């Protein structure tokens, strides 16, 4: 797929573009009821709301800006409520950090209704089901991001329900980390049923029982970093049993430019039938003989978290979007791909996030520039 240290662009298999809009680079995209919501990577760009009811002619209907020193690159929506993260850069300790809540009943005029303030850097990636927000904030007394569940029954007054952390993070409680710096920290939780599946960067992942949400209990943890160097980014449970077993797809994030020379990050298939003993049984990787740099990465990142069957769509940075069939979880099979042209004014592709709408359309956000609307023939 990629040879001589270069990656192809403008190629596809079983996935085609039906629309595109020039936008500043984004960290996340979600779609609901004909509107796409994009969290941008860098200030002053904060969040864009785009009318995508005509996918061939998407139109921006609102754009929120953000102060220098912050970014709000993650967004989630349910009904008339929109949540965006406020995460600050190290040099701007005086700026507020946390989770901002908006009323979006008027899509062209988002109205702030609450701000859940956190300590330190703020909130990274998170999920939201309309009632609860599952967030990854930095909190006072803890080393690095932890997992927190907020009750959003009244979105104007979010209330903490519970928190969970890896042993060693609660420094105010006398715990001592066994790792260096902030290597072990929550990336984001995903809920399925009464379980949270929590990616934990260089701490691997955790499965947490929230059947009693006021008292979360660890079911199991697993960490393969080291020996594998790239951090765990997303832990996504499959919708149904496959081959009469339960499965979770885990992506590590390609950050090779920050590490010694390594194989590019890839995807793991984990058997969670016995959830106290999660067992990796297979991997999926896109071959590449080049190197990641500060400007260009090639490796796994983020799957579409909307799961409808056995095929998942996964962003691969410079490798674009990959469609992977897990009908046989022991032998994951690529069944399609889409690698865009570089965005306006850009030299490389960095496919960062993807949303899979229930009507089948895919929304692919580039880290540098542009939102693509796609159709899959898979």
Regions found by a protein language model. Name each.
Residues 1-378:
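Feature marking well-ordered beta-strand scaffolds used for ligand recognition
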């Amino acid at each position: 797929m990629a040879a001589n240290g270069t990656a192809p662009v403008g190629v596809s298999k079983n996935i085609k573009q039906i629309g595109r809009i020039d936008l500043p680079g984004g960290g996340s995209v979600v779609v609901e009821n004909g509107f796409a919501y994009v969290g941008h990577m860098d200030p002053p760009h904060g969040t864009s709301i785009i009318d995508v009811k005509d996918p061939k002619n998407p139109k921006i209907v609102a754009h929120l800006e953000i102060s220098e020193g912050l970014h709000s690159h993650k967004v989630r929506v349910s009904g008339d409520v929109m949540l965006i993260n406020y995460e600050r850069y190290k040099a701007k300790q005086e700026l507020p950090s946390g989770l901002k809540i908006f009323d979006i009943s008027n899509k062209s005029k988002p109205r702030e209704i609450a701000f859940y303030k956190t300590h330190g850097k703020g909130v990274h990636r998170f999920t939201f089901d309309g009632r609860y927000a599952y967030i990854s904030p930095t909190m006072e007394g803890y080393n690095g991001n932890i997992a927190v569940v907020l009750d959003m029954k009244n979105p104007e007054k979010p209330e903490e329900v519970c928190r969970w952390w890896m042993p060693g993070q609660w420094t105010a409680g006398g715990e001592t980390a066994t790792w260096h710096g902030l290597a072990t920290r929550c990336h984001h939780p995903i809920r399925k049923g009464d379980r949270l599946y929590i990616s934990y960067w260089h701490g691997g992942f955790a499965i947490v029982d929230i059947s009693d949400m006021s008292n979360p209990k660890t079911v199991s943890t697993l960490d393969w970093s080291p020996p594998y160097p790239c951090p765990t980014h997303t832990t996504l449970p499959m919708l149904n049993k496959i081959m009469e077993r339960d499965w979770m797809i885990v992506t590590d994030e390609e950050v090779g430019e920050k590490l010694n020379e390594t194989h590019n990050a890839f995807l793991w298939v984990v058997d969670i039938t016995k959830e106290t003993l999660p067992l990796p049984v297979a991997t999926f990787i896109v071959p590449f003989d080049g190197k990641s740099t500060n400007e260009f990465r090639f490796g796994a990142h983020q799957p579409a978290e909307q799961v409808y069957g056995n095929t998942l769509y996964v962003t691969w940075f410079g490798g674009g979007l990959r469609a992977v069939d897990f009908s046989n979880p022991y032998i994951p099979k690529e069944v399609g791909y889409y690698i865009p042209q570089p965005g306006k004014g850009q030299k490389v592709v960095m496919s960062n996030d993807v949303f899979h709408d229930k009507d089948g359309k895919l929304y692919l956000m580039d880290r540098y520039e542009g939102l693509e609307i796609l159709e899959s023939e898979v």
